[in-house]
């Protein structure tokens, strides 16, 4: 089904000197495996005593090297290498441009707040089904934990998880549960001839799960120790600092279920620790059942006729009246009316992290081509300004990027997020270079040919697979597209000029308030230089970044 999977098959066959047919016929080879063969392998490798040996390197003392005095390199502009000239001479076969067709997916309203998206399966007899319920962890925070358990849950009254998995397997089916801020997902795939039986099993499983108390306790204990140690983990602290800068009190590290609503303990006079787990079978099961009462989009890919599929969908987990959805959820970001600096001190960090945030303007798909062109010009890999000016010229960073991100629905604000990872003693200079790029972007119009080629090919290559087509098309429609974005935008892409990028930059980036977020070693970060150029530095402690 997947083009990339086919490429991987050819790659592996070539690399390991194997026959391509062996990969193509792998399905038949798997079906030919007998129970006796599986038992023989299990006896050979899984029986008897085993020992597990783990070795930890520890953290050896590292030497902090002084910043070398490197003069910026100035590579030649507008010059083409002999390799490039010869590469362009290689003959190519013209490719017929094809576009996505929204008509490939049929939409049908089955009931109020229940919509079917049907895509014909032209490849095989395996169906795929995704139930996308219009509620997520933003409205129902306990879904985060309920979903973890559902992936290993048994079924009432007393069917254990292993037996449930066997029942799915006997029908040639598999399942998984997932959740985001906005949506609760149930994904199922299997042999289409067993569709009705699989849906009956899914419904029983979802509405009557048998959750394991030991797994609940293990999950909550893991959450407890994760929160206990998060202030000591530099990567987590950096993530929490960025969340705080972008979302303030809406940060996921602050706006979450308090630990004392998940677990608490007390110590008896005799020293015995008494644990109380406040998440339990009852409230987690109720959470799942409530989630299946929200508006649901049914994304189905199979060979059955759409009328038969619509009839079968009456068996999915849902209530007589499905509640309206408030999704997708777009968290409100912080806005700043002037450039400011946040700094979190961590003397143990060998590499400092610097983020740059600009809150943008309301998004509209009419901006897509200009935005994509700006992103490619500003941060398009090693040819982009950020990597070229900061890493290639000045050897100032290991990693650097900066691009504009657009929301998943129109009308909400876009934003630019930049990043530089560098040594603490290079932070002040790296900030100066990045800020200069934001406020005085250099002009290299000779790059337009490569940018146009990249955007043209990227637009044509944006073709979702058969099974994901309905969800991708629906997302494009939510943005406001009535046809394939490639078809809509290709003419604008082909007629791009540097003025389009320059205008987008001047209207959205140049001289906008920038929030500079830094985490690094206070002994070597030149805070005086930063303060002199960008004003007051707000020092943030890890305690401010976490709640609950």
Give the ranges of each region predicted by the language model.
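Structured mid-domain segments that build the active-site/substrate or prosthetic-cofactor binding neighborhood
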Residues: 380
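Active-site glycine-rich loop that binds ribose-phosphate moieties when present
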Residues: 278-283
């Amino acid at each position: 089904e997947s083009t990339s999977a086919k490429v991987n098959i050819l790659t592996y066959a070539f690399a390991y000197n194997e026959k391509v047919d062996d990969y193509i016929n792998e399905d038949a080879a798997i079906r030919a495996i007998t129970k006796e063969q599986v038992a023989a392998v299990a006896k050979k490798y899984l029986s008897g005593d085993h020992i597990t040996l783990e070795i930890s390197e520890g953290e050896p003392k590292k030497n902090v090297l002084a910043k070398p005095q490197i003069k910026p390199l100035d590579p030649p502009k507008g010059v083409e290498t002999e390799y490039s000239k010869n590469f362009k001479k290689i003959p190519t076969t013209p490719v017929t441009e094809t576009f996505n067709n929204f008509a490939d997916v049929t939409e049908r309203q089955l009931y109020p707040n229940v919509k079917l998206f049907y895509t014909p399966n032209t490849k095989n007899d395996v169906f795929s089904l995704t139930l996308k319920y219009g509620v997520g962890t933003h409205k129902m925070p306990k879904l985060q934990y309920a979903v973890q358990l559902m992936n290993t849950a048994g079924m009432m009254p007393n069917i254990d998880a292993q037996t449930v998995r066997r029942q799915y397997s006997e029908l040639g089916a598999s399942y998984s549960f997932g959740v985001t801020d906005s949506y609760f997902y149930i994904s199922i795939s299997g042999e289409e001839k067993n569709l009705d039986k699989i849906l009956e099993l899914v419904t029983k499983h979802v509405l009557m799960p048998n959750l394991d108390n030991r797994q609940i306790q293990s999950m909550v204990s893991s959450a407890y120790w994760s929160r206990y140690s998060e202030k000591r983990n530099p990567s987590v602290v950096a993530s929490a600092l960025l969340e705080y800068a972008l979302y303030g009190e809406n940060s996921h590290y602050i706006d979450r279920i308090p630990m004392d609503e998940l677990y608490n303990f007390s110590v008896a006079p005799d020293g015995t620790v008494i644990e109380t787990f406040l998440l339990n079978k009852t409230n987690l099961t109720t959470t799942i059942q409530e989630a299946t009462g929200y508006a649901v989009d049914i994304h189905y890919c199979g060979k059955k006729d759409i009328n038969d599929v619509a009839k079968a969908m009456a068996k999915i987990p849902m209530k007589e009246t499905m509640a309206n959805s408030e999704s997708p959820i777009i968290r409100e970001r912080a806005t700043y009316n002037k450039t400011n600096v946040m700094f979190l001190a961590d003397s143990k960090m060998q590499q400092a992290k610097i983020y740059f945030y600009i809150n943008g303007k309301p998004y509209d798909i009419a901006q897509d081509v200009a935005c994509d062109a700006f992103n490619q010009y500003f941060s398009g890999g090693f040819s982009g300004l950020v990597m070229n000016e900061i890493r290639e010229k000045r050897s100032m960073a290991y990693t650097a990027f900066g691009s504009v991100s657009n929301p998943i629905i129109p009308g909400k604000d876009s934003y630019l997020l930049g990043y530089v990872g560098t040594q603490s003693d290079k932070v002040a200079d790296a900030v100066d270079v990045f800020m200069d790029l934001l406020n005085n972007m250099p002009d290299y119009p000779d790059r337009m040919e490569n940018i146009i080629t990249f955007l043209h090919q990227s637009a044509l290559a944006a073709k979702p697979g058969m099974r994901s087509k309905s969800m991708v098309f629906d997302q494009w429609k939510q943005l406001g597209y009535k046809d394939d974005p490639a078809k809509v935008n290709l003419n604008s892409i082909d007629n791009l000029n540097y003025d389009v990028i320059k205008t987008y930059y001047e209207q959205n980036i140049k001289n906008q308030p920038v929030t500079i977020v830094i985490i690094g070693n206070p002994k070597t970060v030149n805070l005086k230089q930063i303060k002199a150029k960008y004003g007051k530095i707000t020092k943030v402690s890890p305690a401010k970044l976490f709640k609950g």
